[in-house]
Amino acid sequence: VLSLAPAFLIMVTAFTRIIIVLSLIRNAIGVPQLPPNTVLIGLALFLTFFVMAPVAQQIEREAYGPFTDGRISQAEAYSKAEAPVRTFMLRQVREKDLALFVYLARLDQPKTIDEVPTYVVVPAFIISELKTAFQMGFMIFVPFLVIDLVVSTILMSMGMMMLPPVLISLPFKILLFVMVDGWYLLMRALVLSFN
């Protein structure tokens, strides 16, 4: 069970969206090895810690602290720790995705969001995160794709068909990313996408 804990924690936090968007920006620029995976995963982890800090603080205050002090039982601590994570997931989940998993679980239509079991919320949250990450990735890809198309068109019109367009477009894509302060914009968009 403990070996599944890291995977479970990754799936119910902001990590999924962040790592997918960071991976897509790396591919959009055209340098699949830069930044290296360790840097990308480290950045994704620290951004996840940043985004999830209010949830972790609430868990510390309402569940972990009282449990270690002996004021509440383990079952109460679990219940109180689950509540902020559920709230975080429910703020991000799409209604359509939640309805899909309520239907697939063959549950009666819940009257309130609190009636939806956590085992239904988690997969709905995951596919909502995937959809959001791919939407953000698409928006990031478009300007870089335009640069590739323009460079390809110019090279074709000059009769330079043997020269790979990526070789010419890469410096322009890096220049664009640096000129618009891409890391700043990307981090800002990622963090604000969770509010």
Q: Residue locations for each model-derived region?
A:
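Hydrophobic alpha-helical segments and their helix-loop boundaries in membrane
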Residues: 1-195
